[in-house]
């Protein structure tokens, strides 16, 4: 289980304070955070099994994090939740990323997940379990 703590617009000089602990299979290979190729520029670690990420920030100040959640109806071959996290990091802001998350999760192609999309002016949690909200 992953643990995420977020303070949004609490500290005057830091509108987003985020702490995240990834609790994943210790044998699952991953790369440490680094600047990824492409635009916008993104800093994130990479899950080398599925090429996704669990947490990242882009050059616009958008931060996206994913955590697993239960879902009764999981597709037989779900798309990697970490790949969706990387896709959301392509957005210009948190509002757009949250809309993209709702659209993607509504496809039914993912196992259960929560997505936190936050920047200096907007924060959202998209719950992608048996219903999307």
Predicted regions and their residues:
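N-terminal nucleophile
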Residues: 1-133
């Amino acid at each position: 289980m992953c643990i995420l703590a977020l303070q949004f617009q609490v500290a005057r000089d830091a509108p987003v304070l985020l702490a995240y602990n990834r609790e994943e299979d210790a044998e699952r290979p991953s790369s440490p955070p680094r600047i990824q190729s492409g635009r916008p520029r993104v800093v994130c670690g990479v899950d080398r099994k599925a090429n996704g990420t669990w947490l990242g920030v882009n050059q616009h100040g958008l931060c996206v994090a994913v955590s697993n959640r239960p879902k009764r109806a999981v597709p037989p071959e779900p798309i990697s939740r970490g790949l969706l996290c990387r896709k959301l990091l392509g957005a210009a802001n948190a509002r757009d990323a949250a809309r993209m998350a709702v659209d993607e999760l509504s496809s039914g192609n993912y196992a259960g997940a929560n997505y936190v999309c936050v920047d200096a002016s907007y924060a959202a949690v998209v719950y992608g379990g048996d219903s999307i909200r």
